[in-house]
Swiss-Prot record:
Organismal lineage: Bacteria, Bacillati, Actinomycetota, Actinomycetes, Mycobacteriales
Assembly behavior: Interacts with MmpL4. Can also interact with MmpL5.
Gene coding for it: mmpS4
Membrane-traversing stretches: 2-22
Topological type in the membrane: Single-pass membrane protein
Protein purpose: Part of an export system, which is required for biosynthesis and secretion of siderophores. Essential for virulence.
Protein name per its UniProtKB record: Siderophore export accessory protein MmpS4
Keywords on record: Cell inner membrane, Cell membrane, Membrane, Transmembrane, Transmembrane helix, Virulence
GO CC list: plasma membrane
Gene null: resulting phenotype: Deletion mutant does not exhibit a low iron growth phenotype, but has attenuated virulence compared to the wild-type strain. Deletion of both mmpS4 and mmpS5 drastically decreases synthesis and secretion of siderophores, and greatly reduces virulence in mice.
Induction of expression: Transcriptionally regulated by MmpR5. Repressed by iron and IdeR.
A UniProt-annotated Pfam family: Mycobact_memb
Subcellular location: Cell inner membrane
Family: Belongs to the MmpS family.
Amino acid sequence: MLMRTWIPLVILVVVIVGGFTVHRIRGFFGSENRPSYSDTNLENSKPFNPKHLTYEIFGPPGTVADISYFDVNSEPQRVDGAVLPWSLHITTNDAAVMGNIVAQGNSDSIGCRITVDGKVRAERVSNEVNAYTYCLVKSA
């Protein structure tokens, strides 16, 4: 009878010892109660200084342009048939803002400019037939 029962007994002992070992390891590692660093109290948070972003498209007087830009939420917006010079002022309290503007006009010259808090961060002028230009500020 011992000849047939020794294998199940060894398996039972191995399972018991393995279970005990796993129980001890789980009790030793990861058992501490770590403090939570997240806090839902937003009342004391100070807003960032507002950022003032200005998009400008310029060219010869009377130029008509199609303009695409990112708004304050980085959503694409489009203005068709804008008479130049054209500008848009955006104010946000976000920590960072991305500025992107693209324009194509019906004249041989067109330019764009992005200013952040009064400082020119991107400027470009294009001189070609049906001129196309873009300006990009990755982080402001």
